């Protein structure tokens, strides 16, 4: 247990005995911390995580008692902070500890699968082979524990779609996951089928599925970005930009659309298109209330700094870099490849 240092003042023995006699019954009457009170610090950590305040989240985590019953969630949250910082080894270790403490938690297995997947992407061939099998096992376990966990189903479907058969992948398996997604998240099901069709070079079917995902979604801004990404891969630049504009329009009426603004700006930056719109989308994302760990605010500041440099505003670029550093001083900008 981590304890703050306490200053103990010297008292005369008689006074100390009297104070102890009074205090002990009072301590016995003190009720244990309610579960919701115990979770409040973790809620603060999660709020910092979603806001992209990596340094604050880690500081809050360090202040938690190590014997607390919520340690599984604390390790899961630290794993996600480390993922946000691109610290894959540390992330994997923290997520593994969360699973060890609570092996029946679907979310913990999903996040461990994600951390291991990032690690596998950067590993040698032999290491990647063994890691990929672990990724599959974690996603499968996450779905087994909660068959209605739509993000875990989508991750499993993407693994099956991309991975070779030697590590348990396969298009037929991915199609089976799409059928399961139909029951819980139709938009994700259409997106997965779109990715499968795209991989099989059935581009007309892929485009149709991505458009059906837009129609099926209650929050279509992100699905517009998926369609824009498809057009980008096909080098259909005008349609890509139109889809990004549609995502921005949808985001104006959707408080959950922060990720779409971030991803839309990323597409424009990567394709050297419309830097003014890319800047606006990042500004709107950072000024809004829908920031998310999937789109770290400090990375958004770094990308905005690069756009400011391109537009010739060095002072504004430096301000953005300073804000990024204030949120995550350990993050290395070169880790972000979205120039």
Regions found by a protein language model. Name each.
Residues 63-64, 97-98, 141-142, 180-181, ...:
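Canonical positions in the second alpha-helix
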Residues 77-80, 111, 155, 192, ...:
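Canonical tetratricopeptide repeat
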Residues 46, 71, 80, 105, 114, 121, 149, 186, ...:
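Residue-level recognition of tetratricopeptide repeat
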Residues 67, 101, 145, 181-184, ...:
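Structural marker of alpha-solenoid helical repeat scaffolds
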Residues 82-100, 104, 108-148, 154-183, ...:
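Short coil/linker segments at helix-helix boundaries
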Residues 25-84, 338:
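N-terminal leader/linker segments that initiate helical-solenoid repeat arrays
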């Amino acid at each position: 247990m981590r304890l703050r240092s306490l200053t103990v003042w010297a008292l005369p023995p008689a006074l100390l005995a009297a104070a102890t006699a009074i205090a002990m019954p009072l301590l016995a009457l003190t009720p244990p911390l309610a579960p919701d009170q115990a979770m409040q610090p973790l809620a603060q950590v999660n709020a910092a995580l979603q806001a992209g305040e990596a340094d604050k989240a880690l500081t809050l985590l360090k202040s938690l008692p190590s014997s607390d019953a919520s340690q599984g969630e604390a390790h899961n949250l630290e794993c996600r902070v480390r993922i946000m910082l691109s610290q894959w080894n540390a992330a994997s270790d923290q997520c593994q500890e969360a699973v060890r403490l609570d092996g029946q938690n679907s979310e913990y297995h999903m996040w461990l699968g994600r951390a291991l997947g990032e690690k596998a992407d950067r590993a040698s061939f032999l290491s990647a082979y063994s890691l990929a099998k672990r990724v599959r096992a974690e996603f499968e376990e996450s779905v087994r524990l909660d068959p209605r966990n739509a993000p875990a189903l989508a991750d499993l479907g993407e693994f099956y779609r991309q991975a070779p058969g030697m590590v348990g992948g396969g298009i037929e398996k991915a199609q089976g996951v799409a059928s399961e997604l139909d029951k819980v998240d139709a938009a994700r099901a259409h997106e997965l089928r779109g990715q499968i069709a795209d991989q099989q070079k059935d581009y007309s079917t892929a485009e149709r599925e991505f458009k059906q995902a837009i129609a099926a979604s209650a929050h279509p801004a992100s699905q517009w970005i998926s369609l824009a990404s498809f057009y980008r891969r096909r080098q259909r630049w005008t349609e890509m930009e139109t889809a990004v504009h549609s995502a921005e329009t949808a985001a104006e009426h959707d408080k959950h659309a922060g990720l779409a603004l971030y991803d839309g700006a990323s597409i424009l930056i990567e394709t050297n298109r419309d830097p003014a719109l890319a800047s606006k989308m990042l500004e709107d994302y950072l000024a809004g209330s829908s920031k998310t760990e999937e789109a770290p605010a400090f990375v958004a500041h770094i990308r905005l700094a690069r756009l400011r440099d391109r537009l010739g505003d060095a002072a504004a670029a430096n301000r953005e870099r300073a804000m990024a550093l204030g949120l995550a001083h350990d993050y290395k900008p070169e880790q972000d490849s979205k120039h």
